[in-house]
Amino acid sequence: MTTTFPTVEFSAELLNKYNQGIPRYTSYPPATELNKEFDPSDFQTAINLGNYKKTPLSLYCHIPFCAKACYFCGCNTIITQHKPAVDPYLKAVAKQIALVAPLVDQQRPVQQLHWGGGTPNYLTLEQAEFLFNTITDAFPLAENAEISIEINPCYVDKDYIFALRQLGFNRISFGIQDFNSQVQQAVNRIQPEAMLFQVMDWIRQANFDSVNVDLIYGLPHQNLATFRETLRKTAQLNPDRIAVFNFAYVPWLKPVQKKMPESALPPAEEKLKIMQATIADLTEQGYVFIGMDHFAKPDDELAIAQRRGELHRNFQGYTTQPESDLLGFGITSISMLQDVYAQNHKTLKAFYNALDREVMPIEKGFKLSQDDLIRRTVIKELMCQFKLSAQELESKYNLGFDCDFNDYFAKELSALDVLEADGLLRRLGDGLEVTPRGRILIRNIAAVFDTYLQNKSKQQMFSRAI
């Protein structure tokens, strides 16, 4: 059954009004608030609390290596053609796992394992097997665990795909970005159409449970017509999930982006048309619009979770997993434990040095206050469910003993008057509900509850909403 999504109109004035730098809210507070004054002992305390609660676990491992730079990339990467450079890194990750694993109650179910990058398939099969076994020996996976990996389709063959499936991965994701050759040239990611269809065919033959592909809009030389052609070809691939990300052009943070022709970037008006067409075209193809940038088939777990009001969000994006603790391994990885965020060192040197001293390789972190936890829940509900129940929030955090929802968020509710007048949300007797127009600008709605975004200069740290 096709799920339609109403077309919404934006005036130029409204577009300019809301096209501001805003976090993507994969966490609250955003990762930009992590600081080096963080007390590493809070990391241990958070693990202990999770042990006491028997909180399920998700694991993330960062593989930073890439054969060449993709100019659009905002991830932490190491560009090298020297494969042996990977071995010392894998040994260091193994050391981190050996430090963390004894602290974690083995009775806690590990429901997710994800490898991201970088390019995880930069690893040889022998290296991948070593890392996989190191992780699963220390953290036995639940029988129904989601075990996923990101790949660059330029660097795989049929044997590699089948070996990943045999190793234990049951989900796979790869980036297309755009089928258009001019766009691919501009971003230094050449992926012939025939190759992408061949890789998808191998993945289906290997019987992965779920396949996700990533697209990006806002890249150089893109326009409405060319991107709709990319959408058409993507639908022919028939992935289970499609992520369509708004390109974060932040050359002041990611200098490699300066290699792209800035003059060829589509304006905000064109990007909005692209996003609206994306929603229309993919829903016409039978996909369900999930969150702010994901699409899934109606029988996919993401779509089911959204229908049930059970969709969640963490540093990896939207997930079906309930409240779980996320342990991050490798450089730059972020752990998300109870009321604590902790990020590993960003450089190999600092990462290696810490582990050589048998010290947790934590560079910075953040301990959430009660107010942070409340606001995190509000933002998560808005980003995942597109509605907010004041009664449920009051019950969860005992707000009624001191003040109710309306008192606690009096300032924010007043600020929402403007967004309501612009048609982004509507008030309910028991809270808020986001409109179809508001879903496209959901980051703007969430930002009203972000106390860390008051400093205007911080907006320069984030990509624009449109």
UniProtKB/Swiss-Prot annotation:
For binding S-adenosyl-L-methionine 1, which residues are annotated in this chain's numbering?
Answer: Y60, G117, E150, I334
**InterPro entries given in the database record:** Coprogen_oxidase_HemN, Coproporphyrinogen-III_oxidase, Elp3/MiaA/NifB-like_rSAM, HemN_C, rSAM, rSAM_horseshoe
- GO CC list: cytoplasm
What range(s) does the Radical SAM core domain occupy?
A: 51-285
| Enzyme nomenclature, EC number | 1.3.98.3
Which GO molecular-function terms appear in the entry? 4 iron, 4 sulfur cluster binding; coproporphyrinogen dehydrogenase activity; coproporphyrinogen oxidase activity; metal ion binding
Cofactor(s) it depends on? [4Fe-4S] cluster
Instruction: List ligand-binding residues for [4Fe-4S] cluster.
Output: C66, C70, C73
Keywords carried by this UniProt record: 4Fe-4S, Chlorophyll biosynthesis, Cytoplasm, Iron, Iron-sulfur, Metal-binding, Oxidoreductase, Porphyrin biosynthesis, S-adenosyl-L-methionine
Tell me which positions the record assigns to the signal sequence.
Answer: none
Which transformation does this protein catalyse, written as a reaction?
A: coproporphyrinogen III + 2 S-adenosyl-L-methionine = protoporphyrinogen IX + 2 5'-deoxyadenosine + 2 L-methionine + 2 CO2
Annotated S-adenosyl-L-methionine 2 binding sites: F72, G118, T119, Q177, R189, D214, A248
Q: What happens when the gene is disrupted?
A: Cells lacking this gene grow significantly slower than that of the wild-type under microoxic conditions, while they grow normally under aerobic conditions. Coproporphyrin-III is accumulated at a low but significant level in the mutant growing under microoxic conditions.
Cofactor binding mode and count? Binds 1 [4Fe-4S] cluster. The cluster is coordinated with 3 cysteines and an exchangeable S-adenosyl-L-methionine.
Query: Main localisation, per the record?
Result: cytoplasm
Q: What class of enzyme is it?
A: oxidoreductase
- Which pathway does the protein contribute to? Porphyrin-containing compound metabolism; protoporphyrin-IX biosynthesis; protoporphyrinogen-IX from coproporphyrinogen-III (AdoMet route): step 1/1
Q: Which CDD domains match?
A: Radical_SAM
One GO biological process this protein is involved in is: protoporphyrinogen IX biosynthetic process
Tell me what induces its expression: Induced under microoxic conditions.
Assembly: Monomer.
Q: Its biological function? A: Involved in the heme and chlorophyll biosynthesis. Catalyzes the anaerobic oxidative decarboxylation of propionate groups of rings A and B of coproporphyrinogen III to yield the vinyl groups in protoporphyrinogen IX.
Q: Which family is this protein grouped under? A: Belongs to the anaerobic coproporphyrinogen-III oxidase family.
**Protein's name in the database:** Oxygen-independent coproporphyrinogen III oxidase
Q: Which organism is it from?
A: Synechocystis sp. (strain ATCC 27184 / PCC 6803 / Kazusa)
